[in-house]
């Protein structure tokens, strides 16, 4: 999963995104079936929504009710639990900072952490905006509480996350999940089938 791998599938997501959670269940296996790896890139949709004038899908009248039904249906299709945490939506700032702290040490460990965070949010319905929950997950994976506390308050990691969001905006990422495959953008969990076909054909 080397960040420098030119043919890697890039996976942008917000930890607060239900569709990001669903995509996280499938994207690694999908990419691996085509000999590709995945670069996981957590971002924050809040600053992006300020740019686009959007808001969380579940907060949109009429559309939000359908989206909740669709998320539950998609979760049943791939056989994973889904529970909407409260409060929702939530800010995943701490969870994202810890991801990049881990990423710079061990990319595989960062991805393993991301999957646990998603499960805590959307299977256990826990509030991952709380530093205590983020710390607990990292502790469970073998990291010391003092390391986690330091990382959460590290100004360099704060800037790192801001920079990742700015890069995403520059690349015209506007939602979660969002993918780049050979430079081609794909938005949404419902584009995984298109990504699969794109990788089979080599594009079209």
Give short role names for the model-derived ranges.
Residues 4-10, 16-36, 112, 116-204:
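C-terminal cap of thioredoxin/glutaredoxin-like
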Residues 15, 19-121:
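Structural alpha/beta surface segment adjacent to cysteine/selenocysteine redox centers
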């Amino acid at each position: 999963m080397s960040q420098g791998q030119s043919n890697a599938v890039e996976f942008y997501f917000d930890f607060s995104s239900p569709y990001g959670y669903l995509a996280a269940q499938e994207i690694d296996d999908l990419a691996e079936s085509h000999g590709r790896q995945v670069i996981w890139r957590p971002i924050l949709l809040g600053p992006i929504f300020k740019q686009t004038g959007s808001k969380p899908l579940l907060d949109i009248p009429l559309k939000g009710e359908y989206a909740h039904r669709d998320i539950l249906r998609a979760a049943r299709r791939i056989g994973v639990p889904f529970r909407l945490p409260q409060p929702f939506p939530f800010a995943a700032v701490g969870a994202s900072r810890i991801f990049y702290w881990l990423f710079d040490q061990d990319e595989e460990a960062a991805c393993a952490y991301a999957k646990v965070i998603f499960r805590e949010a959307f299977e256990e319905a826990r509030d991952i905006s709380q530093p205590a929950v983020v710390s607990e997950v990292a502790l469970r994976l073998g990291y010391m509480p003092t390391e986690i506390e330091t990382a959460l308050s590290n100004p360099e990691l704060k800037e790192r996350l801001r920079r990742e969001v700015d890069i995403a905006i520059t690349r015209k990422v506007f939602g979660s999940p969002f993918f780049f495959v050979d430079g081609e953008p794909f938005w949404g969990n419902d584009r995984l089938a298109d990504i699969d076909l794109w990788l089979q054909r080599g594009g079209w």
